[in-house]
Structures are given as structure tokens and as C-alpha cells.
Amino acid sequence: TKVTGAASGTSWRGVPSTFAPSNGKWYFELSGSGSYILIGAGSADTGQSQWFELTSIASNSTKAKMMYSYNGGIYGYNSSTDAWQYGFGFGHGTAYNVGVAVDLDNGHMYFSKDGAAYTDSGDPTSGSTGTGAIDLPWYDTESTVFIVTVANSGSTSLLNFGGYTSGSISSAASDANGYGTFEYAPPSGYYALCGKNLAEFG
């Protein structure tokens, strides 16, 4: 999935995943360029149409947790008072690969950049403890979609759930079941979002 922001304007273009799992541990990657990208997870009960065209982050993120590449902050669930909790800046105009590990068995999400350690010393394998995790408050009552949105100024994102990607992959890492093609290996216990894995874990 490729999403590109316009050269000017204020609209946010969003793309939600077509799968909306309720359980399991999932890994996907974002290859991005530019400072105006949001990546994360949201409640499927909100409705996919909300994520296609966001005109305001604040008014459209009542059930989502997303990382903003402008300064690496986490925009959060319910109101702007939950925003910018963690410092994890990407830098402006640079290319990067973001790994996203979503634990829907325990309601946690983790981000890494370019295969390095997870932000806030996060440990995706910490289970219910959620070491360094970003909490997903809706996880035990609603299904979850994974979302990428891009704003103006020409920012571009390529989202890879492990299947077809228009970006280049140099290392071709897969999950423990042998599915997916990622730049970096998924954490232990996390899987590519595909039909066969969903049937087993989702």
C-alpha cells in the first residue's frame, strides 16, 4: 500500500487495513519519507471510512493510537491531552523503516526504527506486563484495524503487511510460520497479517 501526501493543503489521506483482527500478535512495516506521516492502530468499530480522509487529527482519533513522524510523538486515545507521550523523532525529510508490533492478546503496541531497539525500551515479548508499550484501551471489546495516514508536503509511505510491497526489501525476513517478506525479522511470537495466520491466531 502506498500513500502520498499532496504538495500543499491540509487534508490527511488515510488507508486502513482490510483485515481487522480481534486477537493475536501482528507485525508490519512502514517505509516512509517525509515528516507528515501517522502510523498505528484504531478501533474497527469506528468505521473504515473515517480513516480515508482525515481533516483533523484531533477530531478523528478518538479510538486510535498513532505515531506522528513529525516529532515521533504518540497521538492517543480520546483527546489531544494524550498526545506526544514518547519522544521518538524521525527527523525531517529522511527515509526510514518503522517496525510496528501489535499485541492484541494484551492490548499493547510497540514501534522500532530501522531495526533498532523498540521505543521507550519497549519489549514486544513482555506479554501482559507491556514493558515500554503503548496501550490500546479498546482491544478487549472491539476489533482493530492498522492504519497509515499521510498529510501534505509530499510525504510518502509504503505499508508492508508481509505480502506484496512496492518498496525494495534487502533482507527478506519472515515470521516463524515462514510467511511474509519484511526488511527486519518480526519479534518472537508476532506474525504477518495474512489469511493463514489469521485463521490460526486472529
What spans do the regions from the language model cover?
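PRY/SPRY (B30.2) beta-sandwich protein-interaction domains
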Residues: 1-202
